[in-house]
Protein backbone atom coordinates (compact mmCIF):
# COMPACT_ATOMS: atom_id res chain seq x y z
CA UNK A 1 0.00 0.00 0.00
CA UNK A 2 1.20 3.50 -0.90
CA UNK A 3 -0.68 5.21 1.89
CA UNK A 4 2.41 6.58 3.64
CA UNK A 5 2.70 9.39 1.07
CA UNK A 6 -0.68 10.68 2.15
CA UNK A 7 0.20 11.16 5.82
CA UNK A 8 3.84 12.24 6.10
CA UNK A 9 3.67 15.52 8.06
CA UNK A 10 4.67 18.65 6.18
CA UNK A 11 6.47 19.73 9.33
CA UNK A 12 8.48 16.99 10.85
CA UNK A 13 -18.30 14.26 16.31
CA UNK A 14 -20.93 14.09 14.84
CA UNK A 15 -24.03 15.08 16.88
CA UNK A 16 -26.36 12.10 16.75
CA UNK A 17 -28.97 14.14 18.60
CA UNK A 18 -30.64 17.21 17.11
CA UNK A 19 -28.54 16.94 13.95
CA UNK A 20 -29.76 19.35 11.28
CA UNK A 21 -28.69 16.98 8.47
CA UNK A 22 -27.63 20.01 6.46
CA UNK A 23 -26.47 18.01 3.49
CA UNK A 24 -29.81 16.30 3.12
CA UNK A 25 -31.89 19.47 3.09
CA UNK A 26 -31.06 22.28 0.67
CA UNK A 27 -31.01 25.66 2.47
CA UNK A 28 -33.58 28.06 1.10
CA UNK A 29 -30.93 30.65 0.25
CA UNK A 30 -28.48 28.37 -1.56
CA UNK A 31 -28.10 27.20 -5.13
CA UNK A 32 -27.99 23.43 -5.51
CA UNK A 33 -24.86 21.91 -7.03
CA UNK A 34 -26.72 21.17 -10.25
CA UNK A 35 -28.30 24.60 -10.69
CA UNK A 36 -26.75 27.03 -13.17
CA UNK A 37 -25.37 30.34 -11.95
CA UNK A 38 -26.69 32.75 -14.57
CA UNK A 39 -26.93 36.23 -13.06
CA UNK A 40 -26.06 38.46 -10.12
CA UNK A 41 -28.85 37.08 -7.95
CA UNK A 42 -27.95 33.42 -8.43
CA UNK A 43 -24.23 34.18 -8.03
CA UNK A 44 -24.81 35.88 -4.69
CA UNK A 45 -27.20 33.14 -3.62
CA UNK A 46 -24.58 30.52 -4.48
CA UNK A 47 -22.06 32.38 -2.33
CA UNK A 48 -24.45 32.45 0.61
CA UNK A 49 -24.88 28.73 0.11
CA UNK A 50 -21.10 28.32 0.20
CA UNK A 51 -20.92 29.91 3.65
CA UNK A 52 -23.87 27.81 4.78
CA UNK A 53 -21.94 24.70 3.75
CA UNK A 54 -18.91 25.91 5.69
CA UNK A 55 -21.06 26.44 8.79
CA UNK A 56 -22.96 23.13 8.54
CA UNK A 57 -23.13 20.61 11.40
CA UNK A 58 -20.68 18.35 9.62
CA UNK A 59 -18.11 21.12 9.28
CA UNK A 60 -17.56 24.20 11.47
CA UNK A 61 -21.04 23.94 12.98
CA UNK A 62 -19.92 20.97 15.07
CA UNK A 63 -18.28 17.80 13.82
CA UNK A 64 -15.01 18.98 12.27
CA UNK A 65 -14.29 21.29 15.18
CA UNK A 66 -15.06 18.53 17.67
CA UNK A 67 -12.35 16.32 16.16
CA UNK A 68 -9.81 19.03 16.94
CA UNK A 69 -10.69 19.37 20.62
CA UNK A 70 -11.94 15.88 21.50
CA UNK A 71 -8.69 14.34 20.27
CA UNK A 72 -6.62 16.56 22.54
CA UNK A 73 -6.33 16.38 26.32
CA UNK A 74 -8.91 18.87 27.59
CA UNK A 75 -12.19 17.01 27.13
CA UNK A 76 -13.89 13.90 28.48
CA UNK A 77 -16.89 11.93 27.25
CA UNK A 78 -19.87 12.35 29.58
CA UNK A 79 -22.93 11.64 27.45
CA UNK A 80 -24.74 8.79 25.76
CA UNK A 81 -22.94 8.67 22.40
CA UNK A 82 -20.00 6.28 22.75
CA UNK A 83 -18.69 7.27 19.34
CA UNK A 84 -17.18 10.31 21.06
CA UNK A 85 -14.80 8.14 23.07
CA UNK A 86 -13.10 6.91 19.90
CA UNK A 87 -11.55 10.36 19.44
CA UNK A 88 -10.58 10.77 23.07
CA UNK A 89 -8.90 7.34 23.18
CA UNK A 90 -7.45 7.73 19.65
CA UNK A 91 -9.06 4.54 18.40
CA UNK A 92 -11.23 5.93 15.62
CA UNK A 93 -12.81 3.28 13.41
CA UNK A 94 -13.36 3.65 9.69
CA UNK A 95 -17.11 3.21 10.23
CA UNK A 96 -17.24 6.17 12.65
CA UNK A 97 -20.25 8.30 11.72
CA UNK A 98 -18.55 11.57 12.62
CA UNK A 99 -15.70 11.18 10.16
CA UNK A 100 -18.18 10.22 7.43
CA UNK A 101 -20.14 13.40 8.15
CA UNK A 102 -17.04 15.59 8.17
CA UNK A 103 -15.62 14.09 4.96
CA UNK A 104 -18.87 14.53 3.04
CA UNK A 105 -19.49 18.01 4.46
CA UNK A 106 -16.06 19.31 3.52
CA UNK A 107 -16.29 17.90 0.00
CA UNK A 108 -19.78 19.39 -0.35
CA UNK A 109 -18.28 22.75 0.60
CA UNK A 110 -15.50 22.29 -1.96
CA UNK A 111 -18.03 21.47 -4.65
CA UNK A 112 -20.01 24.63 -3.95
CA UNK A 113 -16.77 26.59 -4.25
CA UNK A 114 -15.96 24.81 -7.51
CA UNK A 115 -19.31 25.84 -9.00
CA UNK A 116 -18.65 29.49 -8.17
CA UNK A 117 -15.06 29.42 -9.45
CA UNK A 118 -16.12 27.78 -12.71
CA UNK A 119 -19.32 29.69 -13.41
CA UNK A 120 -19.28 33.19 -11.94
CA UNK A 121 -16.53 34.60 -14.21
CA UNK A 122 -18.58 33.64 -17.29
CA UNK A 123 -21.82 35.32 -16.19
CA UNK A 124 -22.82 38.18 -18.53
CA UNK A 125 -25.41 39.91 -16.35
CA UNK A 126 -24.50 43.65 -16.42
CA UNK A 127 -25.57 43.90 -12.78
CA UNK A 128 -22.77 41.52 -11.86
CA UNK A 129 -19.81 43.87 -12.15
CA UNK A 130 -16.24 42.68 -12.65
CA UNK A 131 -15.44 43.84 -9.13
CA UNK A 132 -18.23 41.74 -7.67
CA UNK A 133 -17.35 38.78 -9.89
CA UNK A 134 -13.81 38.95 -8.59
CA UNK A 135 -14.97 39.19 -5.00
CA UNK A 136 -17.31 36.20 -5.20
CA UNK A 137 -14.72 34.12 -7.02
CA UNK A 138 -12.05 35.11 -4.50
CA UNK A 139 -14.30 34.10 -1.64
CA UNK A 140 -14.77 30.69 -3.24
CA UNK A 141 -11.01 30.25 -3.66
CA UNK A 142 -10.51 31.13 0.02
CA UNK A 143 -13.16 28.69 1.24
CA UNK A 144 -11.76 25.94 -0.98
CA UNK A 145 -8.29 26.62 0.43
CA UNK A 146 -9.62 26.34 3.99
CA UNK A 147 -11.47 23.14 3.12
CA UNK A 148 -8.42 21.44 1.63
CA UNK A 149 -6.31 22.66 4.55
CA UNK A 150 -8.72 21.00 6.96
CA UNK A 151 -8.82 17.80 4.90
CA UNK A 152 -5.01 17.69 4.81
CA UNK A 153 -4.51 18.06 8.54
CA UNK A 154 -7.24 15.53 9.28
CA UNK A 155 -6.59 12.82 6.66
CA UNK A 156 -3.30 13.68 4.95
CA UNK A 157 -3.22 13.74 1.16
CA UNK A 158 -6.70 13.58 -0.36
CA UNK A 159 -8.52 13.57 -3.68
CA UNK A 160 -8.25 17.00 -5.31
CA UNK A 161 -11.62 17.73 -6.90
CA UNK A 162 -11.24 21.07 -8.68
CA UNK A 163 -14.20 21.10 -11.06
CA UNK A 164 -17.92 21.20 -10.20
CA UNK A 165 -19.87 17.96 -10.01
CA UNK A 166 -23.53 17.11 -9.64
CA UNK A 167 -23.22 14.26 -7.12
CA UNK A 168 -20.81 13.18 -4.42
CA UNK A 169 -19.77 10.11 -6.40
CA UNK A 170 -18.67 12.17 -9.42
CA UNK A 171 -15.21 12.45 -7.87
CA UNK A 172 -14.87 8.65 -7.84
CA UNK A 173 -11.83 7.53 -9.75
CA UNK A 174 -9.67 10.47 -8.69
CA UNK A 175 -6.63 9.07 -6.92
CA UNK A 176 -5.43 10.63 -3.71
CA UNK A 177 -2.75 13.27 -4.02
CA UNK A 178 0.20 13.35 -1.65
CA UNK A 179 0.12 15.55 1.44
CA UNK A 180 2.59 17.91 -0.21
CA UNK A 181 0.38 18.16 -3.30
CA UNK A 182 -2.70 18.78 -1.16
CA UNK A 183 -1.01 21.58 0.75
CA UNK A 184 0.28 23.00 -2.54
CA UNK A 185 -3.34 23.27 -3.68
CA UNK A 186 -4.17 25.17 -0.50
CA UNK A 187 -1.44 27.69 -1.23
CA UNK A 188 -2.43 27.96 -4.90
CA UNK A 189 -5.99 28.81 -3.90
CA UNK A 190 -4.88 31.38 -1.34
CA UNK A 191 -2.63 33.00 -3.93
CA UNK A 192 -5.52 33.03 -6.41
CA UNK A 193 -7.92 34.50 -3.85
CA UNK A 194 -5.86 37.43 -2.61
CA UNK A 195 -5.85 39.75 -5.67
CA UNK A 196 -9.56 39.15 -6.25
CA UNK A 197 -10.67 40.23 -2.78
CA UNK A 198 -11.05 43.69 -1.25
CA UNK A 199 -8.71 44.82 1.51
CA UNK A 200 -11.57 45.53 3.87
CA UNK A 201 -12.60 44.22 7.27
CA UNK A 202 -15.50 41.79 7.12
CA UNK A 203 -15.72 39.30 9.95
CA UNK A 204 -18.28 37.12 8.17
CA UNK A 205 -16.87 36.92 4.65
CA UNK A 206 -13.46 36.41 3.12
CA UNK A 207 -11.30 39.43 2.30
CA UNK A 208 -7.59 39.90 1.72
CA UNK A 209 -7.18 40.03 5.50
CA UNK A 210 -8.86 36.65 5.90
CA UNK A 211 -6.47 35.22 3.32
CA UNK A 212 -3.49 36.64 5.21
CA UNK A 213 -4.67 35.05 8.45
CA UNK A 214 -5.00 31.60 6.90
CA UNK A 215 -1.66 32.02 5.16
CA UNK A 216 -0.04 32.69 8.54
CA UNK A 217 -1.50 29.43 9.83
CA UNK A 218 -0.57 27.59 6.64
CA UNK A 219 3.06 28.69 6.80
CA UNK A 220 3.23 27.77 10.49
CA UNK A 221 2.13 24.23 9.62
CA UNK A 222 4.78 24.11 6.89
CA UNK A 223 7.52 25.28 9.23
CA UNK A 224 8.04 28.36 7.05
CA UNK A 225 8.71 30.63 9.98
CA UNK A 226 9.59 33.88 8.21
CA UNK A 227 6.45 33.76 6.09
CA UNK A 228 4.30 32.87 9.11
CA UNK A 229 5.73 35.89 10.91
CA UNK A 230 5.15 38.15 7.91
CA UNK A 231 1.51 37.25 7.40
CA UNK A 232 0.62 37.27 11.10
CA UNK A 233 2.20 40.73 11.32
CA UNK A 234 -0.18 42.03 8.67
CA UNK A 235 -3.12 41.31 10.97
CA UNK A 236 -1.47 42.30 14.23
CA UNK A 237 -0.36 45.58 12.69
CA UNK A 238 -3.93 46.45 11.72
CA UNK A 239 -4.89 47.59 15.21
CA UNK A 240 -7.87 49.61 14.02
CA UNK A 241 -9.52 46.39 12.87
CA UNK A 242 -8.17 43.68 15.17
CA UNK A 243 -7.43 43.75 18.88
CA UNK A 244 -7.15 41.37 21.81
CA UNK A 245 -10.43 42.39 23.40
CA UNK A 246 -10.48 42.51 27.20
CA UNK A 247 -11.29 40.58 29.23
CA UNK A 248 -10.91 37.26 27.45
CA UNK A 249 -14.64 36.55 27.54
CA UNK A 250 -15.46 39.79 25.72
CA UNK A 251 -15.35 38.07 22.32
CA UNK A 252 -18.10 35.60 23.26
CA UNK A 253 -19.88 36.65 26.49
CA UNK A 254 -23.11 38.64 26.65
CA UNK A 255 -24.14 37.53 23.15
CA UNK A 256 -21.17 39.30 21.56
CA UNK A 257 -20.65 38.87 17.83
CA UNK A 258 -18.09 40.18 15.33
CA UNK A 259 -15.82 41.78 17.92
CA UNK A 260 -12.35 43.13 17.14
CA UNK A 261 -11.01 39.74 18.29
CA UNK A 262 -12.57 38.03 15.30
CA UNK A 263 -10.93 37.87 11.89
CA UNK A 264 -13.43 35.38 10.52
CA UNK A 265 -16.44 33.84 12.22
CA UNK A 266 -19.57 32.09 11.02
CA UNK A 267 -23.01 33.31 12.04
CA UNK A 268 -26.09 31.37 13.09
CA UNK A 269 -29.69 32.24 13.83
CA UNK A 270 -32.73 30.95 15.67
CA UNK A 271 -33.70 29.01 12.54
CA UNK A 272 -30.16 27.90 11.64
CA UNK A 273 -28.47 27.01 14.91
CA UNK A 274 -24.93 26.11 15.94
CA UNK A 275 -24.67 22.43 16.89
CA UNK A 276 -22.02 22.95 19.59
CA UNK A 277 -24.31 24.28 22.29
CA UNK A 278 -26.34 21.10 22.62
CA UNK A 279 -23.23 18.98 23.10
CA UNK A 280 -21.57 21.21 25.71
CA UNK A 281 -24.46 22.50 27.82
CA UNK A 282 -25.92 20.29 30.59
CA UNK A 283 -29.53 19.08 30.74
CA UNK A 284 -30.24 21.83 33.28
CA UNK A 285 -29.61 24.27 30.42
CA UNK A 286 -31.48 22.17 27.86
CA UNK A 287 -28.33 20.57 26.49
CA UNK A 288 -27.10 16.97 26.47
CA UNK A 289 -23.53 17.45 27.81
CA UNK A 290 -22.17 14.75 25.53
CA UNK A 291 -18.70 15.91 26.52
CA UNK A 292 -17.23 18.18 29.15
CA UNK A 293 -13.91 19.68 30.26
CA UNK A 294 -11.91 17.01 32.06
CA UNK A 295 -10.60 17.38 35.60
CA UNK A 296 -7.09 18.30 34.49
CA UNK A 297 -8.31 21.10 32.27
CA UNK A 298 -10.74 22.38 34.92
CA UNK A 299 -7.79 22.58 37.30
CA UNK A 300 -5.64 24.43 34.77
CA UNK A 301 -8.21 26.96 33.60
CA UNK A 302 -9.28 27.75 37.17
CA UNK A 303 -5.68 28.24 38.30
CA UNK A 304 -5.28 32.01 38.44
CA UNK A 305 -1.63 31.72 37.35
CA UNK A 306 -2.45 29.61 34.26
CA UNK A 307 -5.99 30.29 33.14
CA UNK A 308 -6.35 33.80 34.46
CA UNK A 309 -9.68 35.27 33.41
CA UNK A 310 -10.15 32.46 30.88
CA UNK A 311 -11.87 30.54 33.66
CA UNK A 312 -15.06 31.88 32.06
CA UNK A 313 -14.68 29.07 29.51
CA UNK A 314 -16.14 26.69 32.08
CA UNK A 315 -19.09 26.75 34.45
CA UNK A 316 -20.58 24.38 37.03
CA UNK A 317 -24.11 23.16 37.66
CA UNK A 318 -25.72 23.22 41.09
CA UNK A 319 -24.96 19.48 41.20
CA UNK A 320 -21.26 20.22 40.77
CA UNK A 321 -20.89 19.16 37.12
CA UNK A 322 -18.44 21.19 35.05
CA UNK A 323 -19.30 22.07 31.48
CA UNK A 324 -17.83 24.12 28.66
CA UNK A 325 -19.42 27.54 28.29
CA UNK A 326 -18.02 28.94 25.04
CA UNK A 327 -21.31 27.97 23.37
CA UNK A 328 -24.16 28.94 25.67
CA UNK A 329 -26.82 30.98 23.85
CA UNK A 330 -30.44 29.96 23.73
CA UNK A 331 -31.37 29.44 20.98
CA UNK A 332 -27.95 28.27 19.80
CA UNK A 333 -26.92 31.36 17.84
CA UNK A 334 -23.30 31.26 19.03
CA UNK A 335 -20.79 32.06 16.26
CA UNK A 336 -18.23 29.50 15.11
CA UNK A 337 -14.81 31.10 15.54
CA UNK A 338 -12.59 30.22 12.57
CA UNK A 339 -9.79 32.81 12.79
CA UNK A 340 -9.02 35.00 15.82
CA UNK A 341 -6.37 37.66 16.37
CA UNK A 342 -5.09 35.78 19.42
CA UNK A 343 -4.04 32.97 17.10
CA UNK A 344 -2.04 35.42 14.99
CA UNK A 345 -0.14 36.59 18.07
CA UNK A 346 0.70 33.01 19.02
CA UNK A 347 1.57 32.08 15.44
CA UNK A 348 4.01 34.97 15.33
CA UNK A 349 5.36 34.11 18.76
CA UNK A 350 6.07 30.53 17.68
CA UNK A 351 7.57 31.60 14.37
CA UNK A 352 9.81 34.14 16.08
CA UNK A 353 10.92 31.60 18.68
CA UNK A 354 11.85 29.21 15.89
CA UNK A 355 13.81 32.03 14.25
CA UNK A 356 15.57 32.63 17.63
CA UNK A 357 13.96 36.07 17.95
CA UNK A 358 13.30 35.20 21.56
CA UNK A 359 12.59 38.68 22.93
CA UNK A 360 10.07 39.36 20.18
CA UNK A 361 8.50 35.93 20.69
CA UNK A 362 8.00 36.68 24.37
CA UNK A 363 6.42 40.03 23.54
CA UNK A 364 3.75 38.30 21.47
CA UNK A 365 3.21 35.53 24.00
CA UNK A 366 2.89 38.05 26.81
CA UNK A 367 0.33 40.08 24.88
CA UNK A 368 -2.00 37.07 25.00
CA UNK A 369 -1.13 36.37 28.63
CA UNK A 370 -1.74 39.99 29.60
CA UNK A 371 -5.20 39.92 28.05
CA UNK A 372 -5.90 36.85 30.19
CA UNK A 373 -4.82 38.74 33.31
CA UNK A 374 -1.54 36.84 33.69
CA UNK A 375 1.95 38.03 34.49
CA UNK A 376 4.72 37.87 31.89
CA UNK A 377 6.16 34.46 31.09
CA UNK A 378 9.40 33.54 32.84
CA UNK A 379 10.54 31.33 29.95
CA UNK A 380 13.95 32.31 28.61
CA UNK A 381 15.41 29.59 26.41
CA UNK A 382 14.09 28.71 22.97
CA UNK A 383 12.79 25.36 24.19
CA UNK A 384 11.10 26.85 27.22
CA UNK A 385 9.47 29.58 25.16
CA UNK A 386 8.13 27.08 22.61
CA UNK A 387 6.71 24.98 25.45
CA UNK A 388 5.14 28.07 27.01
CA UNK A 389 3.49 28.89 23.67
CA UNK A 390 2.21 25.32 23.37
CA UNK A 391 0.71 25.53 26.86
CA UNK A 392 -0.80 28.94 26.15
CA UNK A 393 -2.47 27.65 23.01
CA UNK A 394 -3.93 24.76 25.01
CA UNK A 395 -5.85 27.14 27.27
CA UNK A 396 -6.53 29.95 24.79
CA UNK A 397 -8.16 27.68 22.18
CA UNK A 398 -9.39 24.93 24.49
CA UNK A 399 -12.77 24.40 22.81
CA UNK A 400 -11.71 25.37 19.28
CA UNK A 401 -10.14 22.97 16.74
CA UNK A 402 -6.46 23.43 17.59
CA UNK A 403 -5.08 21.24 20.37
CA UNK A 404 -4.91 17.90 18.54
CA UNK A 405 -3.62 19.43 15.32
CA UNK A 406 -1.03 21.46 17.26
CA UNK A 407 0.39 18.37 18.95
CA UNK A 408 0.53 16.45 15.68
CA UNK A 409 2.20 19.22 13.66
CA UNK A 410 4.88 19.73 16.33
CA UNK A 411 5.49 16.00 16.79
CA UNK A 412 4.36 16.26 20.40
CA UNK A 413 1.40 13.88 20.28
CA UNK A 414 3.52 10.99 21.54
CA UNK A 415 5.07 12.89 24.42
CA UNK A 416 1.92 14.68 25.56
CA UNK A 417 -0.87 12.25 24.70
CA UNK A 418 1.03 8.98 24.58
CA UNK A 419 -0.06 8.39 20.96
CA UNK A 420 3.06 6.66 19.68
CA UNK A 421 1.50 5.06 16.59
CA UNK A 422 2.01 7.72 13.91
CA UNK A 423 -0.61 6.06 11.72
CA UNK A 424 -3.13 7.53 14.16
CA UNK A 425 -1.98 11.07 13.49
CA UNK A 426 -4.49 11.03 10.65
CA UNK A 427 -7.98 9.56 10.67
CA UNK A 428 -9.20 6.63 8.61
CA UNK A 429 -10.90 7.43 5.35
CA UNK A 430 -14.62 6.74 5.95
CA UNK A 431 -15.35 3.10 5.18
CA UNK A 432 -18.32 3.98 3.00
CA UNK A 433 -16.14 6.15 0.77
CA UNK A 434 -13.61 3.39 0.23
CA UNK A 435 -16.35 0.88 -0.56
CA UNK A 436 -17.88 2.97 -3.34
CA UNK A 437 -14.60 4.20 -4.85
CA UNK A 438 -12.00 1.52 -5.52
CA UNK A 439 -9.39 4.11 -6.45
CA UNK A 440 -9.56 5.64 -2.96
CA UNK A 441 -6.86 4.11 -0.77
CA UNK A 442 -7.36 3.73 2.96
CA UNK A 443 -4.84 5.33 5.31
CA UNK A 444 -2.16 2.92 6.51
CA UNK A 445 -3.01 1.09 9.71
CA UNK A 446 -6.80 1.18 9.38
Region spans (language model):
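Hydrophobic-face positions in mid-chain alpha helices that act as interaction patches
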Residues: 75, 82-84, 227-341, 382, ...
